[in-house]
Structures are given as structure tokens and as C-alpha cells.
């Protein structure tokens, strides 16, 4: 009886944790359209990248960009070199 209870409890924990792992809470980014790069860089020093896989075309940068697809899409017009990083520094 104890062995059956332990097995059921173990299975319940395994399925419970594996189900919860798929729903990782993502930080909600308030999507804001900035007037210019100076305003965007006050909040995001390295600019905003669309994905973590993008590489900067313009050479070495001082800061690492913040990754957010929604924020990048809202400020896409500030990406002058079209490398999927807006306002990189």
C-alpha cells in the first residue's frame, strides 16, 4: 500500500511539474512607441533586438540589446541599418 501511494505521488509530482514547465511566465513588456532613439536609449541602453539570434551589422556595440519582438515591431522605423536591432549603441 505504501509503495503504491509513493508511486502515485511521484507520478503526480512529475506530471504536475512537467505541465507547469510549459507555461513559463514571461515578463510583460509594455509596448511603447518612442519618438526617437535618444528616448528609447534612456530606457534600453543597448537598443531593442527582435530576437536573441540577430547580429549587429554596424560593428562592435557598447551595450547588449534588450530582446522583445513586440517592442522592436513597434519601433521598427528606428532601425536604420535593417539588422533587426533598433537604436543599438
Curated annotation (Swiss-Prot):
Keywords tagged on the record: Signal
Name of the featured protein: Uncharacterized protein YhjA
UniProt cross-references to InterPro entries, sorted A to Z: Excalibur_Ca-bd_domain
Signal peptide start and end residues: 1-27
Source organism of the structure: Bacillus subtilis (strain 168)
